[in-house]
Amino acid sequence: MRIFLAGATGAIGRRVALLLRQAGHDVTGTTRTADKSPRLRELGVTPAVVDVFDADALAEAVAVARPEIVIHQLTDLTSAPGTPGYPAAQEANRRIRIEGTRNLMRAAQRAGTRRAIAQSIAFIYPPGEIMRTEDDPLDLAAEGVRQWTVQGIIELEQRVLTTAGIDGIVLRYGYFYGPDTWYDQPPKSPSVHVDAAAHAAVIAVSTGGGVYNVAEDCEIVSSARAKRELGFDPAFRMSR
């Protein structure tokens, strides 16, 4: 299938790109800077150098790719939690989730895309030591920096799930850990290895619909739906 992968050079995007190519898909992947294009070509991915905030340029790139599937792995987190730059990074990430998602979904709709898969987060539910499922409300009472995160996620998910003519899938990932992430081991619950997260996105190309928690087994978030409907395997690891 023809797939447009937005955010193809990030920690999860690179893994998604590789798995898609191994499965035989025709992949166009975005990067904001031309110097990352060779990395995509090495994977067999057609680079699209584009700024997702440039709606016209993004629409043209998607139109050229003519994708049946769009995968949204766009983030803009340049600073880790607890660092001085984290609040600014969260604001940048909120913008990409709102404006970037809007531009991407409009471009996908115009190009005749039939399915969209988007990265969300599983640590978006209200705090508390109870098991959360996809049917539980999000943390609408959040304050401060977390409020920005919740706002961005709500807009992203609604846009992906309600764009006319497109079957939307939202993957609510746990905290990433593994190579190319901030953490070598699970930092806290809910967590998910970056390889297993990428694999879930690839599975969703051909099955499933709606919202899925994608995390390792823990006491606060259930991924039973993703295991049952997608075949999500938290133990999946890519060969090195």
Regions found by a protein language model. Give the residues of each.
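C-terminal amphipathic/interface module of NAD(P)-dependent oxidoreductases
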Residues: 46, 50, 55, 220-240
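Conserved glycine-rich Rossmann-like NAD(P)H-binding loop of the short-chain dehydrogenase/reductase
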Residues: 25-32
